[in-house]
């Protein structure tokens, strides 16, 4: 396994809409394993392939405290079920060091495929529902900062650009 480089906002590659996965092979399995390693080391609870400059519809998530519930969602499709939108603090491995309130639906159904191409569906609530929506947004070229005001988004972008220049 190997750790992958995570793209950071405002990198334009984060705006690429991911394409469906067609081939379920050993290379896909290796990518998924590398994504989990990258997510756990970051540390984070979710990672979309777009964030590591692979523009395929793949998401890995583990919202457990002890990294014991790794979940893979390939070609995910989310359906909003019910509940009033709720505000929750979100962070993102592609927007390091920033946490902002975002409004999301707390109960969703997701249809996806596993690493072998088998289709499945499940319902998700709370943190898992929020994480799924956040990661699927990445696959569609959208970031959580897009839900913020222009003022907040610009402030975050400028701070991250300054950090990038200092590292270069």
Swiss-Prot record:
Gene3D superfamilies registered for this protein in UniProt: Peptide deformylase (3.90.45.10)
Entry's EC annotation: 3.5.1.88
Superkingdom per UniProt: Bacteria
Cofactor note text: Binds 1 Fe(2+) ion.
Active site (catalytic residues): 135
UniProt record, GO biological process: co-translational protein modification; translation
Reaction catalysed by this enzyme: N-terminal N-formyl-L-methionyl-[peptide] + H2O = N-terminal L-methionyl-[peptide] + formate
Residue positions binding Fe cation: 92, 134, 138
Keywords: Hydrolase, Iron, Metal-binding, Protein biosynthesis
InterPro entries linked: Peptide_deformylase, Peptide_deformylase_sf
Enzyme class, UniProt record, top EC level: hydrolase
Function: Removes the formyl group from the N-terminal Met of newly synthesized proteins. Requires at least a dipeptide for an efficient rate of reaction. N-terminal L-methionine is a prerequisite for activity but the enzyme has broad specificity at other positions.
Family: Belongs to the polypeptide deformylase family.
Protein name per Swiss-Prot or TrEMBL: Peptide deformylase
Lineage: Bacteria, Pseudomonadati, Pseudomonadota, Gammaproteobacteria, Oceanospirillales
Gene: def
